Amino acid sequence: MSTFKPLVFSGVQPTGNLHLGNYLGAIKRWVEVQKTEECIYCVVDMHALTVSPDPVELMQSTREVTAAFLAAGIDPKKSIVFNQSRVMQHAELAWVFNCVARIGWMSRMTQFKDKAGKDRENASLGLFAYPSLMAADILLYRATAVPVGEDQKQHLELTRDIAQKFNNDYSDRIASLGVGVDMKVGDEQVSGFFPLTEPMISGPAMRIMSLRDGTKKMSKSDPSDLSRINLIDDEDTITKKIRKAKTDSDGLPSEVDGLEGRPEADNLVGIYAALSSTTKEDVLKEFGGRQFSDLKASLADLAVARLSPITHEMRRLVADPAHIDSVLRDGGEQAGAIAEQTMRHVRDIVGWLQN
């Protein structure tokens, strides 16, 4: 019985400075995952076009994100690292999925509603069809797992829906070509060409919030630079931002339950726990009953110790664009070989002549 080979896929848009939330919520975890899993990590520069970036800035951001990957510990000898636009099979499979997915499915995507806002009629078709390309990114490599944040869970569910509909729509053709793979859907054993990709469950650091508003996710689009710690920030800037982080007037609680309803306190304790690879309970054992100034001082030292080596290596790599380009080129060749193998089967399945 054939089964899908375990494979992890994930990607990041090159749209500005990566920050602490990206590192703790994604990249740090990816570094750990590559030790035990086969991984593909992608800089999704095709997705970036949905926000109409300056072309020169997009190329620079693509290199900076790649530099952050490498500086944080992602090893191109262990994992495939590439930028999406080098492998045009992403767009080819996305078109197939555009013909499989239903408009109603896309219309329910909350991220489109959030990004398009009230001016939906002027939003680009690319933004509307973003989840279809995301599904293609994942399924082009027949990835079995994806580390996802809260804001991407709905898109992964759509990816599974698209995979299942493709498998159902073309079930006879898949069987006749002998390219089906056995998998379990609920209690039923079925055969399909694409896997129903599973989310990788993250630890508590998955959602890092703004330093200025604990109810909002840390974001590179926030107009206040004090709201986030960028991976390119120097030691003094990191310390300043943590010192100025918003808190409430009460001291730190001794129990995790005491963080309820206190988003800024919860965020700082969570960041400390994530950077120190411990738990909120352990942090509060040390700082419970003390003032925020004590936690902030220790957190600043910890953040500098953890992030400064990444910052220095990232700057060194950005100064050597030829090396970054070679990493992306080599990764693109590896990814392209896998992608073409998948698409040869997809073309046969849907009936595109290839002779």
Swiss-Prot record:
It is found in: Cytoplasm. A motif ('HIGH' region) lies at residues 14-22. It comes from the Bacteria. A motif ('KMSKS' region) lies at residues 217-221. One of its GO terms (biological process) is tryptophanyl-tRNA aminoacylation. It catalyses: tRNA(Trp) + L-tryptophan + ATP = L-tryptophyl-tRNA(Trp) + AMP + diphosphate + H(+). Keywords: Aminoacyl-tRNA synthetase, ATP-binding, Cytoplasm, Ligase, Nucleotide-binding, Protein biosynthesis. L-tryptophan binds at D137. InterPro entries: aa-tRNA-synth_I_CS (IPR001412), aa-tRNA-synth_Ic (IPR002305), Rossmann-like_a/b/a_fold (IPR014729), Trp-tRNA-ligase (IPR002306), Trp-tRNA-ligase_bac-type (IPR024109), Trp-tRNA_synthetase (IPR050203). One of its GO terms (cellular component) is cytosol. GO terms for molecular function: ATP binding; tryptophan-tRNA ligase activity. Homodimer. Belongs to the class-I aminoacyl-tRNA synthetase family. PANTHER family: TRYPTOPHAN--TRNA LIGASE, MITOCHONDRIAL. This is Tryptophan--tRNA ligase.
